[in-house]
Amino acid sequence: MRHRKSGRQLNRNSSHRQAMFRNMASSLVSHEIIKTTLPKAKELRRVVEPLITLAKEDSVANRRLAFARTRNIETVAKLFNELGPRFAQRAGGYTRILKCGFRAGDNAPMAYIELVDRPETAAAVEE
């Protein structure tokens, strides 16, 4: 029975799910906005928010914990050098999920997940 088991299975085994969320977390940290299905975005939020909270206090131990969860040095560097200081005064709620319709092939609900306080892109600044 699955009583009180949190998290979505997403029709994947545990290692596939873990690898997928590692990759998606790295993509979200590097690009600061990604488009994915709504259930994946909601689960990704549970992975990324604790990483940013960890990055608010820069220490070797916290960097090692973040690396153990992401397995990506560039992601860890951006977390601790940019995102940690940016969200230092914010007590949680670092991500925003915006619904964006349905996918053409299978009608799956799609969503953008982005980091709040994301700097505007260069194209938007020029306009």
Curated annotation (Swiss-Prot):
GO biological processes: translation
Keyword terms, alphabetized: Ribonucleoprotein, Ribosomal protein
Pfam families given in the database record: Ribosomal_L17 (PF01196)
InterPro entries membership: Ribosomal_bL17, Ribosomal_bL17_CS, Ribosomal_bL17_sf
HAMAP family registered for this protein in UniProt: Ribosomal_bL17
Family as reported in the entry's similarity comment: Belongs to the bacterial ribosomal protein bL17 family.
Subunit structure: Part of the 50S ribosomal subunit. Contacts protein L32.
The protein, known as: Large ribosomal subunit protein bL17
Organism: Mannheimia succiniciproducens (strain KCTC 0769BP / MBEL55E)
Gene behind the chain: rplQ
